[in-house]
Regions:
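Noncatalytic, beta-rich nucleic-acid-contacting surfaces in large DNA/RNA-processing enzymes
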Residues: 1-280
């Protein structure tokens, strides 16, 4: 009933039930995208230790960020209940040293939690030592005029921002390099439309999530690859021919694939004919 009539809240509940499981969280994020449910980056002043719904949007939880977890998220929320964080200095002044260290703040910056403070992410990270030094003496001074000047830096490239997000979430939450690849290769098929191409050859651009290798009866190596684009997932099948041709595919790569769409146990898969690695 909840899934049919209140899909937004249903997905929020599933996401909250998956906190601590990167794999399940990623799966539910893909479900949200397939169902046009918007999930936005966490906010240091709006997010909680759980996922919440606001303005028909799921706001990602602080707890689901790598190296943050529930305890630190709750500590941030507890401090915020005394008043919203005014800026990065106010945040560091109020939470730094209370189980929250420099690495935690770096992760929060890379996750996009501090974007609302008006500085780009590279500027925040490059000034972090300055900010922390101030936080260690600022409570004694109580004088805003003594705050150091922020030195501005050009923002990370779009690809660097995406990689940083991947590092802190384990998946792409806001931007996805697959989108950039599709702009360069207009004949790419979206995975959520793969059912329209059954028994046909297609070109897809995917992120390699995991690789499972097996041996055939003849002792040859073949593999099954779990892959994804911005919206959906699919299984790729690589037969021994690829290993004889010295094709090497690694987890975490983005690849262009040409292959035939087949169906096995009611699930679509692609039997791969050609593979090309994409450097981003």
């Amino acid at each position: 009933y909840l899934k049919a009539h209140y899909p937004l809240y249903f997905m929020k509940q599933l996401l909250n039930g998956s906190i601590g499981s990167e794999t399940k969280t990623k799966d539910y994020i893909y479900e949200c995208k397939k169902n046009n449910i918007k999930v936005i980056l966490p906010s240091i002043n709006k997010s909680y230790d759980i996922h919440i719904v606001r303005d028909n949007t799921i706001i990602f939880s602080l707890s689901s960020i790598k190296n943050i977890g529930t305890n630190i998220a709750k500590q941030i929320v507890f401090e915020r209940e005394k008043g919203s964080f005014k800026d990065i200095f106010d945040f560091a002044l109020r939470v730094y040293g209370k189980s929250i260290n420099k690495k935690h703040i770096e992760v929060l910056i890379d996750a996009g939690c501090m974007d609302e403070f008006g500085y780009n992410r590279k500027t925040l990270k490059e000034n972090l030592d300055l900010i922390i030094n101030y936080s260690e003496i600022g409570s004694l001074l109580d004088d805003d005029e003594l705050r150091p000047e922020i030195v501005f830096y050009n923002e990370y490239t779009k690809i660097e921002l995406m990689k940083n997000e991947l590092n802190v979430y384990g998946f792409y939450l806001s931007n996805n390099p697959i989108t950039e690849v599709k702009l360069k290769y207009p004949n790419i098929v979206n995975l959520n439309e793969i059912n329209l191409y059954f028994d046909k050859f297609v070109n897809i651009a995917v992120y390699v999530d995991s690789i499972r290798e097996i041996k055939t009866k003849n002792g040859d190596k073949m593999s099954f690859i779990e892959a994804s684009d911005e919206i959906d997932k699919i299984e790729l099948v690589l037969f021994p021919k690829f290993y004889r041709d010295n094709v090497v595919i690694k987890e975490g790569e983005i690849i262009l694939v040409n292959g035939k769409v087949e169906k096995r146990f009611d699930k679509y898969q692609i039997v791969v004919s050609k593979v090309k690695e994409i450097n981003i």
